[in-house]
């Protein structure tokens, strides 16, 4: 699928970083796909070969449906599943990027040319704890306005499971009390002074927006301590599967994606639904992009 990760707010989806791809179709045709102007792609589409026939069909689809796609296709960018229809209405059409969301239904990618990104010089974390999970989602737009590199959510279930594992006791010591949700906000920077300014700006904005936290924010500049925080976040999925008994969190609401401004509505609705069935759910992952893993 069109995967990405914690830093998608900086780097986008896989498709956003694909320059070109060599693909193989079910009929045996093997060829290179990449970006091009309408004239360039039309010229290639006039060739009587596998690539030409594919491009002719894609360009015909684009001409017929681009207005409908632009008008009615959901605008939120953080989708890893389903065909990337918005590729058809971008200023420069790149057919190779359609393969990133096709899950093998278009063909097989044999090789790809992709963009590279610079590894950050320094990073910092600000850990924010909330008494209510919905409150953490409501706070996310304010945090996002401070231009972090990532905002990751950990919920009470994940925290409780991690605390129960002796191997993670020291890594999770940064969490105080029993918060319903914890947001780990990461910043990139060239110097420690720059990182401190960014962290201070975030704290100022939280105070100005009157966002209620369950405890004081924690600023983490030390690389080892940051690694401990991320180790707790990454351990979550495996620990969810370690729950004993017949009832376990399962991925039935996976990769749910909506604009950050409305994500709290989804969380509130799911919380009410699972409570109605006297159950619970795990919520974690990419708050910054409006994309959570929700496992009742």
Regions found by a protein language model. Name each.
Residues 87-92, 96-296:
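C-terminal substrate-recognition/cap domain of FAD-linked oxidoreductases
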């Amino acid at each position: 699928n069109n995967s990405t990760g914690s830093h998608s707010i900086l780097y986008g989806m896989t498709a956003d970083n694909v320059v070109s791809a060599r693909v193989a179709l079910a009929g045996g045709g093997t060829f290179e796909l990449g970006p091009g102007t309408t004239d360039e792609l039309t010229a290639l589409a006039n060739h009587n070969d596998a690539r030409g026939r594919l491009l002719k069909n894609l360009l015909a689809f684009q001409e017929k449906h681009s207005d409908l796609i632009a008008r009615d296709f959901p605008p939120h960018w953080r989708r890893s599943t389903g065909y990337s229809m918005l590729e058809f209405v971008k200023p420069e059409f790149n057919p190779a990027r359609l393969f990133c969301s096709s899950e093998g239904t278009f063909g097989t990618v044999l090789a790809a040319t992709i963009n590279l990104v610079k590894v950050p010089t320094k990073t910092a974390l600000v850990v924010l704890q909330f008494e209510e999970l919905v409150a953490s989602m409501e706070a996310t737009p304010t945090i996002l306005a401070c231009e972090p590199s990532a905002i990751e959510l950990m919920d009470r279930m994940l925290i409780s499971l991690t605390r129960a594992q002796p191997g993670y006791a020291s890594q999770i010591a940064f969490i105080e009390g029993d918060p319903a949700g914890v947001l780990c906000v990461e910043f990139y920077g060239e110097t420690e002074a720059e990182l401190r300014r960014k962290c201070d700006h975030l704290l100022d904005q939280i105070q100005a927006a009157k966002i209620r936290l369950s405890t004081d924010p924690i600023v983490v500049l030390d690389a080892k301590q940051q690694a401990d925080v991320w180790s707790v976040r990454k351990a979550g999925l495996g620990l969810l599967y370690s729950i004993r008994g017949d009832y376990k969190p399962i991925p039935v609401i996976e990769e749910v994606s909506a604009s950050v401004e409305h994500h709290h509505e989804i969380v509130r609705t799911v919380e009410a639904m699972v409570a109605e069935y006297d159950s619970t759910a795990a919520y974690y992952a990419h708050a910054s992009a409006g994309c959570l893993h929700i496992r009742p």
